[in-house]
């Protein structure tokens, strides 16, 4: 996983530290943590198992820096009818299925594509019926990748985001402000 492992592991202590790091990185990979919640035609939420065959269609909205790998894993386990994936610009998305529409949005600052993705997700969600199952897969970076400014312009939202970045705000402080600036 660490590309230059051998050159970095030049002492026993460094080797052990790198092995610990690799173990942590591996456990954070979507396929490793999603397998606890997603299996063939089942979703596990807490102690509740959802049988997906009870639904007419299965929809997926995945957004964030790990969106494509989460959506890819899920699409191998369940029969996804259609989905939207929103990832940062310059990401080499691994999604090859034509059932997914992929948006490449701005991060950490939202951009026009973030708004376009936000509108697409809003329309997509509104098209679902009670016979459908909608699964959201959310990872870090989602609030800038998927933006739908509420009563402010995109330029104003970008300005507020820049101020928060420059101030050293924590992610909790970021989210507290941003949830009031977006419809999603």
Language model features: what each stretch is:
Residues 1-139, 143-184:
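N-terminal loops that bind phosphate or other acidic moieties
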